[in-house]
């Protein structure tokens, strides 16, 4: 039976500092925690924190491990956190000529094999949420539970504001100062993913679908993703945008932990 997470946002003067980085750890540049794995012909960079059951963190487009600077200090108290730089981003390798959500999801499935991990909890934000959804279909036995925030499964105006689509199209076709990597990552967002809603019915693991009530991903699209995944849970964060994990980290973290622990 589908469950709806009801969230009441309580503002405090500490909401933006309680999970600030401590001990001057610079995520995505921590030699004590950093590792490389050879997967799918590239060097995939990841950092490991904490102990316990594995939880992999998947960041958004153009981001890095540091995108989860408010999540790692929290979740490392409960899990063995494996935060990954996606292909062609952060410190991970890759080619602008070969980049797709399917390929990135394949990288993460392969990394779990490399680390001899039978199954893991998965938390994905934005593009990382797309990757997590694909993982739940591609290597379903390896995804114990999946939490995604601000994910879309189609790139058209049913999911994104038309103004955003036009901006990406103009950037990809006319920006002469952007790097090949920037063009490739934006082109991927412009034309991918293309996952039929029907395919989501094949997902077997428990899934928490999250979004901000002012997210760039249209609420009706988030709702349709939730409705298409069997036994999924839904959480819409109030007064929140696409970056709710950074905007309201305390609330976000506790919500995800509650889902993982239930």
Locations of the language-model features?
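Conserved loop-alpha-helix segment in the C-terminal half of the alpha/beta-hydrolase fold
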Residues: 213-240
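Conserved hydrolase catalytic core segment
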Residues: 118-156
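Catalytic histidine-centered segment of alpha/beta-hydrolase-like enzymes
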Residues: 240-249
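Short beta-strand/loop motif that positions the catalytic acidic residue
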Residues: 203, 209-211
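Active-site nucleophile elbow and catalytic-triad environment of alpha/beta-hydrolase enzymes
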Residues: 184-199
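Alpha/beta-hydrolase fold catalytic core
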Residues: 4-55, 79, 261-262
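Active-site loop/oxyanion-hole signature of alpha/beta-hydrolase fold enzymes
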Residues: 83-123
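Conserved HGGG/HGGXW glycine-rich cap/lid loop of the alpha/beta-hydrolase fold
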Residues: 42-91
């Amino acid at each position: 039976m589908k469950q709806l997470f009801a969230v009441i946002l309580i503002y405090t003067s500490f909401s933006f500092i309680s999970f600030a980085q401590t001990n001057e750890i610079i995520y995505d540049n921590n030699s004590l925690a950093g590792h490389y794995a050879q997967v799918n012909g590239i060097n995939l960079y990841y950092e490991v924190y904490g102990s316990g059951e594995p939880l992999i963190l998947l960041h958004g487009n153009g981001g890095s491990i540091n995108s989860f600077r408010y999540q790692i200090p929290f979740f490392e108290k409960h899990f063995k956190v494996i935060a990954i730089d996606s292909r062609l981003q952060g410190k991970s390798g890759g080619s602008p000529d070969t980049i797709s959500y399917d390929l990135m999801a394949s990288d993460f499935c392969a990394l779990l094999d490399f680390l001899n991990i039978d199954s893991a909890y998965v938390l994905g934000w934005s593009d990382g949420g797309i990757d997590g959804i694909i993982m739940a279909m591609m290597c379903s036995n390896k995804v114990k539970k999946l939490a995604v925030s601000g994910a879309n499964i189609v790139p058209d105006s049913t999911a994104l504001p038309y103004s955003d689509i036009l901006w990406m199209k103009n950037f990809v076709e006319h920006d002469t100062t952007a790097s090949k990597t920037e063009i490739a990552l934006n082109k991927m967002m412009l034309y991918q993913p293309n996952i039929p809603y029907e395919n989501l019915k094949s997902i077997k693991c428990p899934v928490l679908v999250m979004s901000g009530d002012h997210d760039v991903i249209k609420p009706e699209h988030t709702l349709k993703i939730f409705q298409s995944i069997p036994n999924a849970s839904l959480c819409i964060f109030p007064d929140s945008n696409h970056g709710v994990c950074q905007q309201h980290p305390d609330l976000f973290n506790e919500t995800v932990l509650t889902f993982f622990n239930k």
